[in-house]
Amino acid sequence: MYKAFGIVSSSGRNIYVDGMQDYRPIGAFSFLGRYRVIDFPISNMTNSDIDRIQVYINNKPRSVVEHVGTGRHYNINSKSGKLQLLFSEHNNDNDIYNTDISCYLDNMESLSRMNHPYVVIAPSYMVYSIDFDQFLHTHIESGADVTLLYHAVDNAKEAYLTCNVLGLNRQKGVESIEPNHGNKKNQYVYMDTCVMKTELFISLIKEAKNLSSMYTLADILNDKCETLDIRGVAHKGFFASITDFPSYYAANMALLNYKSAQELFHENWPIYTRTNDSCPTQYFNTADVKNSVISNGCQIEGTVENSVIGRGCVIKKGAVVRNSVVLAEVTVGEDVHIENEVVDKWAKLVHKKEIVSPAEQPGYIRRNDTL
């Protein structure tokens, strides 16, 4: 691995997941019952032998701090490696100054002390697998100033509406980085992942500050498309951009498909996470489970279909959970039917017997709520 350090960036003001983000940043969202979203970029880095990682947090840090901790569970070299949690002074979700550039500026001293020649930047709100070692090698071999990672999609009219898209020429040179306006179905979605020299990165941060206090890294890179050699590299495999509530629900549901899960999880590419000591899930005689992901520590007496169930959940006798994402420590009472819902932690669904939302507009049940 060439000498590179990693940055896991936080989400900007244009990204907001209704309901769930009231309690924690997207990186701390539960994913597939067992993981947190931030586990994926950090694991990609440690699997690629990047053992100096900076994680940037711009609001509600407690959940990320508790989960990431010192980073020991991410298999970071304890002698040469280090995971830093860095914070922004602009912690209002909708603050116009709440940008990745402002977060980097607040921590410029830590950035300036990194003596690695290259930096790899990945977002805390996207789920995918990639070998950053190969990504960096491709960048260096090409001679480009900056290399951006993108994913080709054919549903950009309905999805990825809070993402940026790339304009590419025939040689995969980047001509523009612009918001997805939903006017074309085929787009190259920018995965907010890039590699460049550390010296260039720091100079871009300073230049962006002088141009506009609202500038993001994508904005300054877009300005530099004509003067810098910026190239795109296509990503293959599973990709989910968790930038709004429907995309969070859809990403969990998509991975119930075995083929999609195989594109994300690989035998020689582990996704690390903080482990919990809990007993195996108990399945009682009345339990009926189909095409679902069930975490440890649950008690299942009812029916679970096409759903993700977090740790320590209780599904009582006669209960039906269908097409839903249920976070940890939720109780679904007897004969309660929930469908097309995201149920946040510690909720108790006991009195209202039918909680069903339209399939095209899944519902959300608040954390620690009782229905």
Show where each model-derived region lies.
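Unchanged
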Residues: M1-A254, I365
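Left-handed beta-helix
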Residues: M1-S10, E199, K209-L371
